[in-house]
From Swiss-Prot:
It comes from the Bacteria. Part of the 50S ribosomal subunit. Keywords: Ribonucleoprotein, Ribosomal protein, RNA-binding, rRNA-binding, tRNA-binding. GO terms for cellular component: cytosolic large ribosomal subunit. PANTHER family: 50S/60S RIBOSOMAL PROTEIN L16, LARGE RIBOSOMAL SUBUNIT PROTEIN UL16M. InterPro entries: Ribosomal_uL16, Ribosomal_uL16_bact-type, Ribosomal_uL16_CS, Ribosomal_uL16_dom, Ribosomal_uL16_sf. HAMAP family: Ribosomal_uL16 (MF_01342). Binds 23S rRNA and is also seen to make contacts with the A and possibly P site tRNAs. Belongs to the universal ribosomal protein uL16 family. This is Large ribosomal subunit protein uL16. GO terms for molecular function: rRNA binding; structural constituent of ribosome; tRNA binding.
Length: 136
């Protein structure tokens, strides 16, 4: 699963998921899966969607993952009293703003790409849409 190799600090504040997305254009492939809603994706969800797409296209073409989970989420163990410091890192997430391209695909037909992205979208907790690269 995806997670950073090193970080300057192990734990992070919760913060707020506001603002506009960077990476809103399809830049590597021909087709893309773009976020419509706002939320956060865990490393497990990113990997699960990638596997669904890869299996559907039967390993033909190429898939790019445009998001990376770089924010640690902590949790305290069950039945532990409040206080005594922040909990341990449980999993990693990527914060998503509307318009962010999550995945890109190339080397497959549009119909196959739509089906594969549909399977991937079912694994994700945010609303997404299918986009095609615009040639200037």
């Amino acid at each position: 699963m995806l997670q950073p190799k090193r970080m300057k600090f192990r734990k992070m504040h919760k913060g707020r998921n506001r603002g506009l997305a960077a990476g809103t254009e399809v830049s590597f492939g021909t087709f893309g899966l773009k976020a419509v809603g706002r939320g956060r994706l865990t490393a497990r969800q990113i990997e699960s969607a990638r596997r669904a797409m890869t299996r559907h296209v039967k390993r033909q073409g190429k898939i790019w993952i445009r998001v990376f989970p770089d924010k640690p989420i902590t949790a305290k163990p069950l039945e532990v009293r409040m206080g005594k410091g922040k909990g341990n890192v449980e999993y990693w997430v990527c914060q998503i703003q509307p318009g962010k391209v999550l995945y890109e695909m190339d080397g497959v037909s549009e119909e196959l790409a739509r089906e594969a992205f549909g399977l991937a979208a079912a694994k994700l907790p945010i609303k997404t849409t299918f986009v095609i690269k615009t040639v200037m």
